[in-house]
């Protein structure tokens, strides 16, 4: 009587396990990249919202309000990245949390710069900066920023 053995040999099983393991490692790497990307996008979204909130507050001030004063003259172009020492105003609550307050995780710094008579006479150019940092492996802290310019008229 002729009987054929059925099933897999140990070598076939090991090769299958190795291939499955390589595939799972790739999926894990993709998951880590997705989580990192989502975190980065969330931080940028919050920073943009904080900058926009500050612009709205500044737009509601009178044209002569001290928060719209051009303290450091001739600093319309602050360079890239801007020199923080040349920026006119800092949020008094710095560092701030996701809502602009001081009760949560305070990871953002908010500044704004005013340039009188830019780009034309009688107009103020307002640029709001929001900075935050992320830990970047062995390289340490990576600084990020959102910069939103607008103009203010009397």
Regions found by a protein language model. Name each.
Residues 42-154:
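Low-complexity, Gly/Pro-rich coil/beta segments used as flexible assembly/activation regions
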Residues 4-52:
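Aliphatic-rich helix starts adjacent to a transmembrane/signal segment
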């Amino acid at each position: 009587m002729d009987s054929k053995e059925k099933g897999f040999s140990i070598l076939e099983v090991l090769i299958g396990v190795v291939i499955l393991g390589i595939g799972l490692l790739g999926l894990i790497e993709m998951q880590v990249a997705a989580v990192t990307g989502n975190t980065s996008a969330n931080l940028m979204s919050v920073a943009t919202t904080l900058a926009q909130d500050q612009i709205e507050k500044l737009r509601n001030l009178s044209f002569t309000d001290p928060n719209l004063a051009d303290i450091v003259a001739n600093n319309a172009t602050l360079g890239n990245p801007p020199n923080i020492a040349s920026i006119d105003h800092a949020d008094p609550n710095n560092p701030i949390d996701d809502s602009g307050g001081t009760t949560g995780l305070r990871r953002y710094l908010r500044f704004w710069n005013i340039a009188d008579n830019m780009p034309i006479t009688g107009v103020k150019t307002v640029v709001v900066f929001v900075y935050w940092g992320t830990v970047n492996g062995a390289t340490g802290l990576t600084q990020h920023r959102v910069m939103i310019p607008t103009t203010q008229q009397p």
